[in-house]
Design a protein with these regions (language model features):
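Short catalytic/ligand-gating loop segments at beta-alpha or beta-beta junctions
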Residues: 185
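Metabolite-binding pocket within alpha/beta catalytic cores that recognizes anionic/polar moieties
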Residues: 1-175, 179-182
């Protein structure tokens, strides 16, 4: 990786999130609004680290002895992209050298957020589990998502709803859906 592609703060933390590797748990809850971070972390047994840089607020602590990090992404897919790239860098890049680590790590990411449609039968602050997501800005085309791309539903939307702009539909992985559908979080 070119050093210009990964900007660090003077303290060695990643630029936007102001996090270092040791500040990050392997389980990360992502929320949009920075005020939602406190709504979640007020239930933590212990807080070990807090930081904020503009809309990016991060808190790491423990809940029932499980270490968790909560990060706010701000608004929009481009902000989420920044957050995910910096989180990935924290676990898969040597921040001193900029070299990709030989052993790659995956984070457990859980997105908790609001949807664009509120229905009378769904109370505010309810938890919903989505089986599909629709990308309206084409941002996800930057990634290889062929394993979850739902081309038939995308075609249906385009043909039956006279949508001019291209939409892309992605399925939640069945493994992830089944895990959350059968577990009380």
């Amino acid at each position: 990786m070119d050093r210009s592609e990964l900007i660090l703060n003077k303290d060695g933390s990643v630029y936007h999130l102001k996090l270092k590797s040791e500040n990050l748990s392997s389980t990360v809850i992502l929320v949009g609004d920075p005020f939602r971070v406190d709504k979640i972390t007020k239930h933590f047994d212990k807080i070990e680290f807090k930081t904020q840089n503009r809309e990016f607020k991060s808190v790491t602590g423990s809940y029932k002895s499980k270490r968790i990090t909560v990060v706010s992404t701000g608004i929009g897919s481009s902000n989420i992209d920044i957050v995910l790239n910096e989180l990935d860098a924290l676990v898969n890049i040597d921040l001193q050298t900029g070299e990709v680590l030989n052993s790659r790590k995956s984070l457990n990411l859980i997105r908790i957020g609001t949807s664009g449609a509120i229905q009378d039968d769904v109370p505010v602050d309810s938890f919903l589990l989505s089986k599909m997501a629709i990308d309206i800005d084409g941002f996800m085309l930057n990634y290889d998502l062929s394993n979850i791309d739902n081309k038939s539903f995308t075609k249906y939307l385009s043909e039956n709803h006279q949508i001019q702009d291209p939409l892309y539909c992605y399925n939640c992985s069945s493994e992830l859906y089944d895990k959350f559908n059968s577990t009380v979080v």
